[in-house]
């Protein structure tokens, strides 16, 4: 399995379910992702939500930051397979290590024919630079990552929260997914944890579903648009 998993408290589970049911009911929201998920997560953890209009949004790593030093990177994925041990992945960074080779400690340059260990080391350094830079900028000392997995109908979901430290170069072995340099894979503990494709410079991180993920089901129905708007206006007028 992957890194250490943090469980939700009973109160947080209740807030997660309530927040998701409320969000999916709203007819002007097409899905829970991006800022909608960020806002709901602030509700789950009971931390202040910055106003995206007056305070803006950033491309920094941590989408929610608490005053105690915790900072969460938040992801959502639509998944068909929620079984324990199943893999899921997402892009964490565009890593153009060929262009930044000297900056990453390879002054002689890098290309797809370079030593595979050097390519892997460059990828980890590229990611760690962003991780460490954003930790400092956002005052984060405890960095988890949270993934909300949803089935197609958004009725069956799973929540998992992993520790999210920087990567260690010595932990990984590297190999091409097939001859010709199509995709580079970073292996750790006999499993693929990183994937990188030179053509698009995208770096993916791969996780395995842990035994103690929080699985749950929701029952919700979209409100009609007119009822939703009228109820909001009525509530604001009270």
Put a short name on every predicted segment:
Residues 58-71:
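Short acidic loop-to-beta-strand element that houses the catalytic metal-binding Asp/Glu
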Residues 1-60, 76-238:
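Nucleic-acid endonuclease domains
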